[in-house]
Every structure is written in C-alpha cells, then in structure tokens.
C-alpha cells in the first residue's frame, strides 16, 4: 500500500476540488469561488476556513434551498439542479446512516476496487493463498436500488458493486438475488444469509461491521434452532475486514462465532463522504491510514467544538493534515470531487501520526449531555467490553445496549441485551451488572462523576433484555448505542416489547 507525502497529496486534492467547484452556485454562495487555488496553501486554507463553514447534511440542504429558492423539491432533484454543486448530473445517491441521501462521485464509487486490492495485500501479509474461485462477500443494510429521475439510490456498497466494470470479477452478494428484499433491513439480512448458505464454501474474505456479524449470527442461530458458529456457514473464511465500526463490545461473542476457523481480522473506515482509511500494518489493530491521494480533502475539528448532537460550532478551530496534532481527538470533515465542501462525517477519531496520516476510529460524535455528563459510545463500549471479560466465567455476554436520558427522572434509561433470557440468570448477578456498569462509568469519566456528585444526574435504571431483544424491530435511522429521543422513548419501546427485568443502580459515590 502506498501513501507517502501526506501533506503534498492533501494540498493537491484541495486545489483540485476548489478548481472543480469554482463555477458552481454553491461556491458562489459560500465565497469559495473567489479563492485563488494557486495561492500558498496556509493562506489559501485560512481564507477558505473564513468563508466556508463546516456543515452537516441538514445545513447543506438548507443552504441549497436558499440558493435555489426551492422549498419543495426532494433532495435528488434539488442537488441535481444544473450548476448548483456539480457541473454534471449525479447518477448515484447513497443513503447516510441517518436516512438522508448524498451524491457519490466517481472516486467513492471506485473505492471498492481499492478495498479489493487491500484484501489481496492483507492475504500476502499473512501468506494466505487465494484461488481464482475464492470470493469476497460485502454486507450492507438495505438491498434495493431505487431508480428515480435518472439516478440510482441505494446503500453505498450496493452502488459500488453495481458500478464495478463488466470486465472485473464481481464480489458477492449477487445483487439481482437480494434486490427483492427491498428497503427492509431484516429482509436484506435474510437474503444475504441465503446467499452465504449457498456460496459460503467459496467465501474467503468477509467485509462487514461487527454489528452486522452479530446480527447475522443471531439470524443464523435462529434458523438452526441453536447457537451456531460460522464453521459450517463459512468453512474457508480467512479474512474478516471490520468495516467502519467499533469492535471491543462484541469481541467475546465474535470470537465464539469464529471458533474452529483461522480468521485474520483487519479494520477499515469508509464513509459516503469519500473518506477511506485502511489498516496497513496488520499487527496494529485499529490504526488506520487515511488514503490522502484519492481526491478527498480532510479537515479535523477538536471534539470540544462539537455539541452533543454532533453539530460543529461556528467558532470551531479547524486543522488539516499538515497542522493536525497526534494524540488528540477530532471530528473529521471532508470535501470531495462531488462538490461537497467541509461536510462533517460526525465520526470522532484520534490522530496517531501526521505523516502518514493515521487515525483510530472511536465513535459517532453524538452523546448524552443534558446533565453535562458526556456519555458516549466509546466510553460505554470500553466499560461493557471490560465487564464482558468478567462475565465470561458466568457464561453471560452483554451482546448489545442502548441508553437514553429521562429528563423527568434525571437519569439514564438503559436496555441491555444479554445472550440468554434474564429469567435464567440469578437476580443478584443482574443487579451486580447494573451496579458494576454505573461504578465503572464513575471511575472512568470525570464528567459523569461530576454530574452524579452535583445531583444533576441520578443513578441509572437498566432493563435486561433476552437475546434478540434489540433486534425485534428496526432501529430508527442513525440510532446505535445512544438514544437521543425525548425521554429515552426508543429504549422504552424496546423494553415494553420484551420480557425484561428492571434494576436500578445503587447511589454509589467515587471519592
């Protein structure tokens, strides 16, 4: 894998993007069209930062509607208005994690070829020989590709697969066989499992998030009528590419799924903004090298300038590859060849090194912070991963979780999904789990501890759910781990639709 001269590559990408969008109405509105892309980079970036704000999808669409004075068109028709953000009509739109749609440029569509090359690189590093009949399988959440007004709308992975040139070998799944699953995530999972059961012997590489693997394992076990490992489903699997997601909370469960298989795990990060990072050193799990030579420009905003909903504050400081500081946490923003300028990924990363530009993916930017407690998924994942190691001797695993905030009770409301029915577990153990999570959060978070100490936050209440309890219906768009709805309504919906046991943590103080 080649990725040298990070700063020079980023300067080149930045100038290229500015030159490409110069004649667009969006560039005129922001002031980016007035910039001289041949100017020295430090001065150019400073001027750019003054005129172009970092924005999320809602802010982008709001600006585009102001420019066009169009309050009624759908997002596809709006974005494809002539000369608005691009010089050509976009033919591919991908769904964001929150259910919006965003145009994909050619760079993003072709990134699956980079991932295929990366898998070959990983196999060479591990001395794994792949035959011509061996296949890679890509998992994604929604199967259908919808056609609207000259454009295809789908999950990014589905669009990438659909746009692979005819003369190249196409990875799995076979799109035409899963399209009938439509927009249902559950039906898409069923369709993918159908293909895995038919073609599993030829699959040697699996590209999927930890969450997708856990969901797949639950469905596979339901079909078999017992807990089932992947040894029979994917007998020749050698490489798992952990696709854009945190792993540790599911580590023990996934290890049990791969029992009897010699599977090597590597990590990647891929966003519909065009951001792509790969674990180039197979011995350094989670350390990802951003691909800075692919026509994408990265910006970094310190997390202290991001609110609890993931929105970047207007006063935010902004850094580029040449000025970013190692060992600090940032929210990444991206500008790309599609004409999107400084769009936030809403992902928090820790920068490891500047050249090459390496990061560790931590979490989504959203957090629970109404009591100034700053409870986020990275912290919770670490706590639950540590607790799962203790629970291993009891044959108990916390498989998944969701936590929200009840403003009336001033406490967090949790739903914890266990690997077995809570009715089969001693209540003393369940109560201990609740108290242990609360105590570990107090020990590991000054803000959580302070909120408890000042009585702005009361001890949490936790609903213990059986296996599959957080998969009985599809989660709202964008919800994973943290429930930002009013008074934890999503968490309560899961609790009310499950047989569950409820426990409240003791009022522990950490001195």
Where on the chain are the PLM-derived regions?
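Active-site glycine/GP-rich loop and adjacent strand/helix microenvironment
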Residues: 1-35, 40-41, 45, 162-511
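Active-site diphosphate/adenylate-binding microenvironment
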Residues: 12-16, 27, 31-93, 99-106, ...
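Cofactor-binding loop segments of dinucleotide-utilizing enzymes, especially the Rossmann-like FAD-
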Residues: 87, 140-142, 243
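Short alpha-helical patches at coil-to-helix transitions and adjacent helical residues
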Residues: 88, 112-116, 210-213
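Ser/Thr-centric signal marking residues that sit
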Residues: 94-95, 204
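Long, hydrophobic, well-ordered secondary-structure blocks that form the structural core
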Residues: 106-114, 240-241
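Residues forming well-ordered secondary-structure scaffolds
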Residues: 110-117, 132, 249
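Conserved AMP-binding loop of ANL adenylate-forming enzymes
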Residues: 120-172, 179-180
């Amino acid at each position: 894998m080649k990725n040298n001269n990070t700063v020079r590559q980023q300067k080149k990408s930045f100038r290229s993007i500015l030159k490409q969008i110069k004649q667009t109405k969006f560039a005129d509105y922001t002031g980016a069209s007035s910039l001289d892309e041949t100017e020295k980079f430090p001065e150019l970036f400073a001027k750019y930062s003054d005129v172009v704000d970092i924005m999320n999808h809602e802010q982008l669409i709001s600006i585009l509607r102001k420019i066009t004075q169009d309050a009624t068109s759908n997002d596809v028709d709006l974005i494809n208005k002539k000369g608005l953000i691009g010089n050509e009509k976009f033919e591919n739109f991908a769904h964001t994690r929150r259910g919006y749609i965003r145009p994909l440029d050619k760079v993003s569509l072709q990134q699956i070829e980079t991932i295929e090359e990366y898998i070959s690189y990983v196999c060479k590093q591990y001395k794994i020989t792949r035959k011509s009949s061996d296949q890679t399988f890509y998992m994604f959440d929604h199967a259908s590709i919808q056609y609207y007004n000259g454009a295809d709308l789908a999950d990014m992975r589905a669009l990438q697969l659909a746009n692979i040139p005819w003369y190249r070998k196409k990875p799995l799944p076979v799109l035409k066989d899963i399209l009938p699953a439509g927009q249902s995530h559950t039906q898409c999972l069923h369709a993918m499992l159908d293909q895995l059961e038919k073609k599993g012997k030829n699959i040697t590489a699996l590209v999927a998030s930890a969450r997708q693997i856990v969901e797949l394992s639950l469905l596979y076990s339901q079909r078999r009528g017992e807990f089932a490992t992947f040894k029979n489903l994917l007998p020749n699997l050698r490489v798992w590419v952990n696709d854009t997601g945190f792993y540790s909370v599911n580590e023990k469960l996934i290890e049990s799924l791969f029992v009897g298989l010699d599977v090597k795990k590597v990590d990647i990060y891929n966003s519909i903004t065009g951001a792509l990072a790969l674990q180039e050193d197979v011995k350094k799990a989670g350390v990802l090298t951003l691909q800075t030579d692919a026509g994408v420009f990265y910006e970094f905003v310190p997390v202290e300038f991001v609110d609890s909903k993931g929105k970047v504050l207007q006063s935010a400081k902004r850094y580029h590859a040449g000025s970013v500081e190692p060992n600090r946490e940032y929210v990444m923003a991206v500008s790309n060849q599609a004409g999107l300028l400084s769009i936030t990924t809403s992902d928090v990363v820790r920068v490891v090194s500047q050249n090459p530009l390496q990061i560790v993916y931590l979490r989504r930017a959203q957090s629970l912070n109404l009591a100034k407690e700053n409870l986020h998924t990275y912290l919770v994942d670490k706590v639950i991963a540590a607790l799962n190691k203790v629970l291993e001797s009891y044959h108990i695993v916390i498989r998944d979780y969701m936590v929200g905030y009840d403003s009336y009770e001033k406490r967090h409301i949790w739903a914890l999904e266990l690997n077995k029915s809570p009715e089969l577990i001693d209540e003393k153990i369940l109560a201990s789990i609740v108290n242990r999570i609360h105590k570990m959060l107090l020990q590991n978070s000054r803000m959580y501890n302070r909120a408890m100490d000042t009585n702005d936050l009361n001890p949490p209440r936790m609903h213990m759910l059986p296996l599959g309890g957080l998969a009985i219906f599809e989660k709202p768009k964008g919800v994973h781990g943290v429930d930002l709805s009013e008074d934890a309504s999503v968490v309560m919906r899961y609790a009310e639709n499950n047989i569950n046991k409820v426990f409240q943590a003791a009022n522990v103080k950490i001195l």
